[in-house]
Amino acid sequence: MKKGAKRKGVSKAGRKAAVAETQNDEVIEETTKTTQEESQQHEEEVVDEVKENGEEEEAKGDQEEEEDAKPDSLEEDEENQEDEVKAEEVKEEVEKKPVARRGGKRKRATKKDTEIKDEKKPVPKAKKPRAAKVKEEPVYFEEKRSLEDLWKVAFPVGTEWDQLDALYEFNWDFQNLEEALEEGGKLYGKKVYVFGCTEPQLVPYKGANKIVHVPAVVVIESPFPPSDKIGITSVQREVEEIIPMKKMKMDWLPYIPIEKRDRQVDKMNSQIFTLGCTQRRSALRHMKEDQLKKFEYCLPYFYQPFKEDELEQSTEVQIMFPSEPPVVCEFDWEFDELQEFVDKLVEEEALPAEQADEFKEYVKEQVRAAKKANREAKDARKKAIEEMSEDTKQAFQKMKFYKFYPQPSPDTPDVSGVQSPFINRYYGKAHEVL
């Protein structure tokens, strides 16, 4: 009987353990289904723990074999109670075991937790309606003309430094100059030398007369530079100076049209040269007054050997007698008689009577100097012609001067009534005014 009881107990304990394992597997399978992200490794650990519990139960069943057999009814009740307790313990351990998830442990949020979190979230503010953006129309800039800035590049020789800004007060239109140098124009393909000048004029503008510094551009058609010298002269200066351009930081520079400035160009093959000045305006305040005034008295110099100079023909001299106040006048040695000239000045109280004799000597000195200069100029002209090659002679004889004024436009004063062919005392008059 004892052996049978023991075998019966062992079989019951085995069946109970199998039932417990089945229940644990169902719990694990159910947990796996609800959380698809559970790692496979952790599942195997849970199953191993359950199996270990089953082995412990089998070991306990073997120990029961060694114990004395109990009555069947009591033994069955005790075994049932022990199996139920163990099954509940295994179930509790599985439920208590935290389920591993990828990315770390997290607690499953309950409905209550979700409601609490929703209460803590700030109520989003109502966004203001955005105003519809107005599509801006594209702005088109007028393409610059190839020679548009030529008149600005040509330095306005003889203009006072503080008047340069007034010269560019208006956007002057020099398309007539551009057209003459472009294809189809009278100067197209010809080598030219360009310089600027200014002429203060009283012109009508917006219903009123206004003094305006009118720009003009002089173009010399020549195969070589017309001159490399600058003349410095004025009524206030007693002596006229003819000096090299470079002493005044001026020179003939090749002009590059706007359309060619973005690539390398052979400047030596340029057809347009402008008289440029490299003197920086910022350095003028450190310059002496006499040197500064020289820029204002500069005139582009030109010597035409085949045309008698106006100085050679003139019989007048500029008189600036040093007295208080200075006596400034002109004396013509062919038409004026010196004694009558002096008496008239004394009578008009322009000259003190006690300085009459001194004034006479001063005038005679000026006349002698002027006559000497005329003789020297004639001799120099004859010598230059003798030493000149035939090509140079022909170039001088074919040389032409053109003077350009700005065209009328709505934004600029009308200068059509003040145009003049006169350039300066050295160049004389232009062959054509455009």
From Swiss-Prot:
Region (Disordered): 1-131
Any coiled-coil regions, as ranges: 363-394
Biased composition (Acidic residues): 54-82
Ranges of biased composition (kind: Basic and acidic residues): 30-53, 83-98, 111-122
Matching InterPro entries: HIT4
Motif range (Nuclear localization signal 2): 95-102
Subcellular compartments: Nucleus; Nucleus, Nucleolus
Gene deletion effect: Embryo lethal in homozygous plants. Hypersensitivity to heat leading to the inability to withstand prolonged heat stress (4 days at 37 degrees Celsius), probably due to impaired heat-induced chromocentre decondensation associated with attenuated heat reactivation of various transcriptional gene silencing (TGS) loci.
Record's keyword terms, sorted: Coiled coil, Nucleus, Stress response
Signal peptide span: none
Top-rank lineage group of the source organism: Eukaryota
GO cellular component, one term: chromocenter
Composition skew (Basic residues), residue ranges: 1-15, 99-110
Predominant location: nucleus
Motif placement: Nuclear localization signal 1: 1-8
Protein role: Essential protein required for basal thermotolerance, especially during heat-induced chromocentre decondensation, thus regulating transcriptional gene silencing (TGS).
Protein name: Protein HEAT INTOLERANT 4
Classification of source organism: Eukaryota, Viridiplantae, Streptophyta, Embryophyta, Tracheophyta
Gene that specifies this protein: HIT4
